[in-house]
A protein has these predicted regions:
Chain B
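HAD-like aspartate-dependent phosphatase fold
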Residues: 1-261
Length: 371, 261
């Protein structure tokens, strides 16, 4: 067990303590107005912090510490030297903030949207809410909090499970989207009906917008079910086209990320209602291998029937997705096939793998998955 | 009238070092479905007692001469159960519960019993009893009947982060002092086990505050030698769903503690 030998005086000095008025107040009432003012000045900024929304009203995004920040070095310590050494290392480096990870730009963009939403609807709880969900031990908590402070992130909620599965907590937090580095946890979440994806650090990080959140989705097995992909994998391209043509007017079944697209759409409408369609800080993209003239029609009809608007639909008819994504520069791109995820990452796009559907049986990975 | 009976089946603990936890017999034994037999059914606090026992067992495994152990006493305030004191002792023996003493007192003077026995934590299913014990300076917590329905084998103690950050005020409210010393002892016990597979887990929950409160609580607890296993920061989110996943046995706050409000 890690033994702490911290001088309490050292620890306690320089701490910003929140002004607390507990219900069972110990009678320490700040009667004079001056005293209260003075106290507040010590806590500049705290009184202007907006109140986090109720999870069921918000679009809750749960991110793990390994995708929000870069923790490769620490991971190595854990793998090579075990948990005690890992925790010791974390505590030793407590005042060193982690560098941003693959989910960082996405989270920053969510916060930018929140700022715009609050301007237009100051009383509304229909906002993004970010929860840090990690199965790290609470020992790492202080370093994570220091890092959040350093990067000026607005994250007030977290869940450090100390080794137990985070899945139960995802449900308790009404999670709309879960991002993690651990493919197993992501699969578990998907099995529980929670939209989830595994994120990877791209080799180079292309710049993304800091005023407009851009989310790109693959179609089959992400927004839609994998039924068509099954046909393609089992019977080939011709059969796939035939099937899509024959079933053009039958809606596709929904996929794991449909709900998240829906949630984004709801927020978009709030901007449209205030005349900000052109200036909307949320933009969504469909990037699919389907063709506009044929198989794409069924996809569009399905989206329309679901009442979901997607801002740009890009039908690549089998062409590589990398260059298109490089132009779009999404904060996150969801695809069920590792092949596409890796291809995107190679070109600097932040891609997330949705381990769902038939494609998982045919993984053609270039590198080993999910660390 | 207050009376104390020692349980001769169980080895008595070191009075200076042991952590005395008093639980009401009404919480441990189910007297509702009374068939008049010798032995009571198990109640809400039964799994808690088993978890406390497990911690003791593991502490003794680490060091057979360990004296920092839980010392569990059963306190009976219920008039009905008092009349059947032998049934309480026989039920305790029947289940092999590690209870070192039985205290019998009336509703009026049970707090006297707590103070006499140097009780550091009092657990009950009765809100009034929690209030009264707290008012008399004894750290006490309400056992939640809902949460007890899916008990865990591991002793899970929840510490409220909103209470920890209170700066040391002078004079310190009596409940605060009790909470601090109890959590320090808990921290000492926790240190005897490794990161994984511990029979005791300390869970910090910040119900109202955000990350600043949580950070302060973590630092304060660490300065007292309390290493927290799990930390959850709710920042005002409804506590129900998260508590049912957390499944704490009880919540430590300062003075009056309620798991569910």
């Amino acid at each position: 067990m890690v033994k702490m030998s911290l001088d309490p005086v050292q620890v306690m000095s320089g701490q910003v303590k929140e002004l607390k008025v507990a219900p069972s107040s110990n009678g320490e009432s700040r009667g004079s107005w001056e005293a209260k003012e003075e106290f507040d000045q010590d806590h500049l900024g705290l009184t202007t912090k907006p109140k986090p929304p109720k999870p069921e009203n918000a679009v809750t995004v749960a991110v793990s510490s390994r995708v929000l920040f870069r923790t490769e070095r620490e991971q190595k310590v854990f793998e090579q030297k075990g948990v005690e050494e890992y925790l010791r290392y974390q505590i030793e480096h407590e005042t060193e903030p982690f560098a941003p990870g693959p989910a960082f730009p996405f989270v920053k963009a969510l916060e930018a949207v929140n700022t715009r939403l609050r301007e237009l609807y100051p009383q509304s709880e229909e906002l993004f809410d970010i929860v840090l969900v990690t199965y790290n031990h609470a020992h790492v908590g202080i370093r994570l909090i220091n890092t959040i402070n350093h990067h000026n992130l607005f994250i007030e909620r977290f869940c450090m499970t100390g080794g137990s599965s985070p899945i139960g907590y995802l449900k308790a937090w009404h999670t709309n989207l879960y991002l993690s580095a651990d493919a197993d946890k992501v699969r578990e979440a998907l099995a529980e009906g929670i939209a989830a994806a595994t994120m990877f650090m791209p080799e180079k990080l292309t710049e993304v917008s800091d005023t407009q959140l851009r989310v790109a989705f693959d179609g089959d097995a992400v927004l839609f079910s994998d039924e068509s992909e099954r046909i393609f994998k089992a019977h080939g391209l011709d059969k796939f086209f035939e099937h899509e043509r024959d079933n053009e007017d039958t809606l596709l079944d929904h996929g794991p990320l449909k709900g998240f697209l829906e949630a984004l759409g709801k927020l978009q409408k709030k901007f449209y209602a205030k005349g900000q369609r052109l200036d909307c800080p949320i933009r969504t993209y469909l990037v699919t291998a389907r063709s506009a003239a044929s198989s794409g029609i069924r996809a569009l009809k399905t989206l329309r029937a679901w009442g979901l608007e997607i801002d740009e639909a890009l039908f690549l008819a089998g062409a590589p997705k990398g260059p298109m994504l490089e132009k779009i520069r999404p904060h996150i791109y969801f695809d069920d096939q590792m092949f596409h995820v890796e291809g995107a990452a190679e070109m600097g796009t932040i891609a997330a793998h949705v381990p769902y559907g038939i494609a998982q049986k045919y993984t053609k990975q270039k590198t080993s998955a999910g660390k | 009238m207050v009376s104390t009976i020692q349980n001769t089946d169980v080895k008595q603990k070191d009075a200076d070092r042991a952590v005395v936890v008093a639980v009401t017999s009404r919480a441990v034994f189910e007297s509702a479905a009374d068939d008049g037999g010798d032995v009571y059914g198990v109640g809400v606090a039964f799994p808690l007692l088993q978890a406390l026992h497990k911690v003791n067992e593991r502490l003794l495994e680490e060091s057979s001469a360990e004296s920092l152990l839980f010392d569990v006493i059963l306190i009976t305030t219920d008039d009905q159960q008092q009349q059947q004191s032998s049934r309480i002792t026989s039920s305790t023996r029947h289940y092999g519960l590690e209870v070192s003493r039985f205290c019998f007192s009336s509703q009026e003077d049970f707090t006297e019993s707590l103070l006499k026995n140097n009780v550091q934590l009092f657990l009950t299913i009765d809100r009034d009893e929690v209030l009264r014990a707290s008012q008399n300076g004894v750290l006490s917590a309400l056992l939640d009947q809902q949460l007890a329905s899916c008990p865990s084998e591991q002793l899970r103690v929840m510490i409220s982060g909103d209470a920890v950050i209170k700066p040391d005020t002078d004079p310190m409210p009596p409940g605060q002092k009790g909470a601090q010393s109890f959590s320090t002892q808990l921290g000492q016990m926790r240190q005897k086990f490794g990161i994984f597979n511990s029979p005791l887990s300390i869970v910090l929950v910040t119900l109202h505050g955000g990350r600043e409160s949580c950070g302060d609580a973590l630092r304060t607890l660490r300065s007292r030698g309390v290493s927290v296993d799990e930390a959850h920061c709710l920042a005002g989110a409804p506590r129900g769903p998260i508590l049912s996943v957390l499944r704490p046995h009880f919540l430590l706050s300062d003075g009056v503690s309620y798991l569910q409000e």
